[in-house]
Amino acid sequence: MELKNKVSNLPSKPGCYLYLNKDKHVIYVGKAKNLKKRVSSYFDRAQNLKTTRLVREIADLEYFVVSNEKESLLLEENLIKKYRPKYNVLLNDDKAYPYIIITNEKDPTYKYVRKLDKKAFRSFGPLPIGSNARETLITLQRLFPLRRCKGNLGKPCLHYFIGQCSGACFKEVNKEYYQEQIKRVDNFFKGNINEVKTLLTNQMHKAAENLQFEEAQRIKEQIISLDFTTTKQNVEFKSQTDVDVISYFIEDEKIAIVTLFYRSGKLLFKDEHIQLYFEQDITDLIDSFMSQIYDKNILPDKIIVDNEVELFDLNEKYKSISTHPIKEDEKIIYKLATENAQEAIRKSKISTTINIGNENELLLELQEKANLQKEPYRLEMFDISNIGNEFIVGSCVVYINGKPARNEFRKYNIESKFTSDYDRLKEMLYRRFQKALIEKRMLPDLIIMDGGIIQIHAAKEIINALGLSEIQVIGLVKDEHHNTSFLIDTNEEQVIIKDKPKLFNWLSSIQVRVDEYAKSGFRKKQNNSFLKSDLEQIEGLGKKRIQDLFKKFNTINEIESADQEELFKILKNKKALDNLNIYLKNRK
């Protein structure tokens, strides 16, 4: 049935609709109280005003009828997670922001989490990603000690001896002690950090007097790293409440959505999201954005959104806490959020102009240069990094519609006995695509191998064996200086790409990214290997327990900041844990 007839025959019932392009990729998922009315509005709007980018790409549609709006909301969220359409609001996995929590126990402890524990006694955050949140956790553990061991050990733990545990390991700790410590932590996160700075400064001077200069420098860096929570704000809320302010700015088929996170009236941090815009309903768009944010993060006391956003549906979902800017301070801060969204669009334009250009143009150029049968909406590039036969790590970077999809990047530990890159590549590619088939994940339109004919043949051997011969394969070859040189197309012929500067720079950036991603995995594996050798000297650990530690924790710093109960669950041996604690203490 033709698309026009499908639209005219849609039912006037609630449901979800999916738009597909000519390659049968789902490019947009939406929900509607009335399917016929909503879907028809897209095409009517396109004829009456202008043909939007989305409408130009729609080749087919599918739909699901549901009983009510609540069902359509849940279905829409699941379909977006499944297909990750390029025209929907798609937030990366890193939108699960870090939090520091205090557990709700008789003897509470601190924890650093990404997945919120709703049973926590206190939750502090969300904290900016890359904000030294773990350093802040260590600072709190040292200055305002709660329980830092399993508790009820019958004798003081190591952390108690160095003043970093409440003593729940060997004695009854009164409730008033914890109340006082938590009150001091509350004050710290409200921006009252004079006490913290004084304590740290005293520790720094003491370390310097004892000629412990490395320790003094580390404490100094801790003091500096606390600034992200306490920077003096030019604009603050008069009330001491938690407020999120969500604004947006639209220009040239792009929308920037900016969220300002205020905690206890002070701006904690700002988050930006930019994507394509095609005149979709702004309430639906903000609703979808909020669904993904608050699916993984704590709801504040209030959410302020634009006057254009209808509040009825939002307040049904978010407990009547959504509002338009009404008070004077709310209007001022909302204006600030809008200005930040405008600036995000401006920076995006500059970045696009300088670095690459229009992604669609690049994909079309690549299609032509590499002799591809279709435009590569999704491409995956593979590389391997190693020293001889040690620390072998494979990497895969994924680009969707010309942009990196970082949450889909993957590293592969290559443990096989093969000594040739050809066989190692085959192992990585087999694992990658066998799993994709089993889990019914989206497959790439194009595979780019970091290398030449040998690497291309390794890829073709695997995809043909798995019945995936429709996936196209090309190679990107480096020169003797390890810089991008030329492309090998689908006919396995060399193609010069330097005559297309934007395409060349873009492909070169992908090659650098996959190379660095592989090397980062290799370096981590190498460092962990050296560290594991060091840890093997600790009595009671052994290779198996060390492997178990590194399955749970990525670095020695994460092991150091873990609570004792968590470490004991892994080691299952008190003497091994005691020896590990002594090692961690002595390495500082």
Curated annotation (Swiss-Prot):
GO terms for biological process, alphabetical: nucleotide-excision repair; SOS response
Intracellular or extracellular location(s): Cytoplasm
Keyword Cytoplasm belongs to the record: yes
Keyword NADP: no
InterPro entries linked: GIY-YIG_endonuc (IPR000305), GIY-YIG_endonuc_sf (IPR035901), GIY-YIG_UvrC_Cho (IPR047296), RuvA_2-like (IPR010994), UVR_dom (IPR001943), UVR_dom_sf (IPR036876), UvrABC_protein_C (IPR050066), UvrC (IPR004791)
GO cellular component, one term: cytoplasm
Keywords per UniProt: Cytoplasm, DNA damage, DNA excision, DNA repair, Excision nuclease, SOS response
Record domain GIY-YIG: where: 12-89
Top-level taxon of origin: Bacteria
Boundaries of every UVR domain copy: 194-229
PROSITE patterns hit by this protein: GIY_YIG, UVR, UVRC
GO-annotated molecular function: DNA binding; excinuclease ABC activity
Function: The UvrABC repair system catalyzes the recognition and processing of DNA lesions. UvrC both incises the 5' and 3' sides of the lesion. The N-terminal half is responsible for the 3' incision and the C-terminal half is responsible for the 5' incision.
Protein family according to the UniProt entry: Belongs to the UvrC family.
Complex formation: Interacts with UvrB in an incision complex.
Identification of the protein by name: UvrABC system protein C
Gene name tied to this protein: uvrC
